[in-house]
Amino acid sequence: MSSIDVVIPTYKPDDKFLTLIERLERQTVKPDRIIVMNTEQKYYDRLIYGSHFQDKYKNVEVYHISKREFDHGRTRHMAMKRTQGDFALFMTQDAVPVDEKLIEELLAAFQDGAVAVAYARQLPSKESGVIERYTREFNYPVVSMVKSADDLEHLGIKTYFCSNVCAMYRKSAYEELGGFVKHTIFNEDMIFAAAVIKSGYKIAYRAEAQVVHSHDFTNREQLKRNFDLGVSQADHPEIFAGVSSGAEGKKLVKQTADYLRKTGNRRLIGRLYIQSGCKYMGYLLGKNYKKLPKRWIACLTTNKEFWDNDNRMKASTRIDVTKGYGKTEEEQKMRKEK
């Protein structure tokens, strides 16, 4: 029988995280271990203080890192290295399983030996607005599907879509492909999904596996999130240069506007257009971030730590360990000429 570990990165977890753990423990296919990669211990300790959490959930392992250490790709990769199962289910702290068959349904996708990763359907919360509810339906339809390189021509960038808000990975395939990129602002799941497709493996979308997960972001938040998305695509032209996301975005806006008209919500169309404009503006700025002043980037990003880490990583490549000091521009030029 296959063994399964769960990985959950957390930062300032709340009651949804506790509900998530409780529902994971009630699954028809139980996880062997639940690995929590927590950023900033004080917030985690504050949540579980006096709850006997660790006594209640013996299979939960918690590892603490600082906010400065966190990276969307590297932190998840560190967690994967700690797993021992045949499969690893990655979730976010605010994704709540709808029923007790989440793991069972995701695991069923791997009956096809070519499937490297399977992701779940995300349903909106009861508090979600009309636009967010339709967006979830657009991105996570009621019909399951399996995607391969053959789908690139008609699905375009959606071939690579695979959200690790709730996604299960075949560990052998993950290791074969090198895992998540180790330094990224965002979008590590899609970057890895592209490697899956390009290597000949498949991605399964399991509509039967469901979690409640949605966000009603403000226009400013949408702009900043899509700025980070644009940065991730600009940093990986080998993946995204050949596929356009613009057509998919236009399709979403058009279909959402049509839906609002049909359901008597015409008053929300203006809000939709403003929100979509903020998304697109953020995305374009992110795609062209190398042309922007650093102070702009600091205002536009949701992930300031990424840029701090990025600067440190770039600086470390300039260190000559044989001399003990940073290389000058002249020394770098001489080395290239050699």
Regions found by a protein language model. Give the residues of each.
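Non-catalytic, C-terminal membrane-associated alpha-helical segments of glycosyltransferases
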Residues: 228, 242-338
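Glycine-rich, basic loop-to-helix element that forms the pyrophosphate-binding segment
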Residues: 66-83
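Short aromatic/hydrophobic "clamp" motif used to bind/position activated sugar donors
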Residues: 88
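A recurrent flexible, glycine/aromatic-enriched loop bordering the glycosyltransferase active site
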Residues: 149-169, 185
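Short beta-strand/loop segment that forms part of the nucleotide-sugar
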Residues: 32-42, 63-65
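Short, well-formed alpha-helical segments that are part of the catalytic scaffolds
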Residues: 13-26
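Conserved donor NDP-sugar-binding/catalytic core segment of glycosyltransferases
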Residues: 100-133
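Acidic donor-binding loop at a coil-to-helix junction in glycosyltransferase catalytic cores
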Residues: 185-192
